[in-house]
């Protein structure tokens, strides 16, 4: 098996619930590294397709372009489809990106919108959704996931000063920026939140989904 593996090779991971009405989740990425983990086992480390935001560098000088046009050109340079850009439509007389990653260029553009025009982009995020790349303060389109006591909620740790964390049984299909309704009767807690971080864990000790919500500490 190891002989057939190569770095940057396409990878697809599929997991979910079997049986009638089962829900499945397909994750796509590329091989970052691999090494033996036992006599008949290979450990493969893979990264998501959004890695292109960090691997792609840009050098651009733009004049008199609206911010959303600049953002679309930056995101499109990754080779990934661009689904939606929802940012203030300010026009920059001149803006330069000098051999920086796309992620860094987007941060530079966001900082310019905040510093030069006084906009608050603290709720905005960049993510790769079902239809492509988003830069928006909205949510990923799709159904609202429900996590609740006596059904699938394992633990819930609200943190008013930082990132709150809820752990549930596995939730195939849940991705960044999807809406989640958390009902924790033990804490008398019921809120509709935006998933700022999603970690699916599959293992011999059980399958869980960890959801970070309520605070976005930044990226890139």
Predicted regions located by residue number:
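Glycine-rich, acidic and aromatic/proline-enriched surface loops and short helix-turn segments
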Residues: 36-37, 67-83
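Short beta-strand-centered interaction patches in the first periplasmic/extracellular domains
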Residues: 41-53, 78, 82-156
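Extracytoplasmic/secreted envelope proteins and their assembly/folding machinery
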Residues: 28, 68-72, 103-107
């Amino acid at each position: 098996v190891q002989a057939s593996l190569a770095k940057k090779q396409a990878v697809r991971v599929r997991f979910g619930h079997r049986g009638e009405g089962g829900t499945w989740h397909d994750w796509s990425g590329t091989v970052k590294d691999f090494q033996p983990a036992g006599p008949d086992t290979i450990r493969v480390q893979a990264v998501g397709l959004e890695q292109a935001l960090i691997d792609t560098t840009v050098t651009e000088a733009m004049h008199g372009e609206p911010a959303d046009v600049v953002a679309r050109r930056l995101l499109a340079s990754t080779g990934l489809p661009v689904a939606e850009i929802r940012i203030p439509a300010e026009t920059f007389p001149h803006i330069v990106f000098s051999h920086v990653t796309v992620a860094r260029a987007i941060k530079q553009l966001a900082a310019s919108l905040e510093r030069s025009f006084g906009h608050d982009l603290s709720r905005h995020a960049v993510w790769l959704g079902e239809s492509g790349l988003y830069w928006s303060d909205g949510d990923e389109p799709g159904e609202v996931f429900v996590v609740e006591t006596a059904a699938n909620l394992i633990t819930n740790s609200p943190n008013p000063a930082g990132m709150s964390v809820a752990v549930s049984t596995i939730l195939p299909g849940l991705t960044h920026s999807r809406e989640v309704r958390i009902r924790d009767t033990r804490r008398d807690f019921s809120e509709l939140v935006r998933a700022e971080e999603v970690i699916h864990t599959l293992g011999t000790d059980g399958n869980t989904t960890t959801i970070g919500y309520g605070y976005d500490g930044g990226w890139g």
